[in-house]
Amino acid sequence: MFRTMMRAKLHRATVTEANLNYVGSITIDEDLMDAVNIVENEKVQIVNNNNGARLETYVIKGERGSGVVCLNGAAARLVQPGDKVIIICYGLVTEEEVHKQEPKIAVLDDNNQIIEMLGAEKAGTIL
């Protein structure tokens, strides 16, 4: 049996742009992608802290060091520049791997720079 587990997260990313006329996806600074091991075209879930919207899309590499987090296409209707979002990536693991796998979590500042890397989340933690 396989379980779907969180394996990567960009916590409190700031949306820098929403581009309705783009084909689709989310553009993310490649440095942020590397920090949590998200790859281009990988499926991600996006949770908007400002309005509660949740959506799924795929990732396009953004310019390194730019801090870009741009929702493209129809997803642009669910965010505004300045919104805080959580970008989550899941993976399938076997029963044997469930307790061994450790997610990579990057906590971001208002400019989408990493301020802290976490390997786990604890209940009741406020960031």
UniProtKB/Swiss-Prot annotation:
Its cofactor is pyruvate. The modification Pyruvic acid (Ser) is found at residue 25. The active site is at 25 (schiff-base intermediate with substrate), 58 (proton donor). Binds 1 pyruvoyl group covalently per subunit. GO terms for cellular component: cytosol. Gene3D superfamilies: 2.40.40.20. It catalyses: L-aspartate + H(+) = beta-alanine + CO2. Belongs to the PanD family. This is Aspartate 1-decarboxylase. It comes from Bacillus cereus (strain G9842).
